[in-house]
Amino acid sequence: MRIVQLDLEHEAALRDFLAELAAHGETDIHGFFGEPEWTHAETVAAFTRWSCGDPPPGWVPSTTSFLVDGARILGVSNFRHWLTPHLLERGGHVGYTVRPSERGRGHAPRLLRDAARRARRMGLRQLLVVCDSGNLASARVIEKCGGAFESESPTDSGPIRRYWIDLRRAAAPTGRTDHL
């Protein structure tokens, strides 16, 4: 298993990943902002531009990463490089989704830890991660990765839980970050 950036070789794997989510009624995919009408090449190009600091107007630079095992995508994460007022209120720095058939196997913490490492390398001191209040599995993932509960906030789509991960405290004294 490895965490990679989307490439042209992942076209069939991405289609399969999205189909499994859709079959489970999941169309609002946290961590994935591709457009249905885009070709795979357009999706790859957009993710590359966004990670290099060239997002669409009104968006922030972000890095979308995929956890893959062989030719199969297991999960996706999106790390927003900074927060707008909207992201501070309800979106956070990181969104992630694991395909339904792979949930409960430790993939979500791996994606969140990778995003935390990226954030630390960019000089961030804290990482805001939110989840729907009813999503107890995601809340456990965030807490497992060092998230400290801040508050529960109402939104148009229901209440969310807000957590902060202190990236300064999360680093091991040896400089290792693989424990995150």
Q: Positions of the model-derived regions?
A:
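Mobile, glycine-rich extracellular loop/lid and propeptide segments
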Residues: 77, 103, 132
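Conserved GNAT acetyl-CoA-binding A-motif
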Residues: 119-130
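Conserved acetyl-CoA-binding loop-helix of GNAT-fold acetyltransferases
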Residues: 95-98, 104-121, 139-144
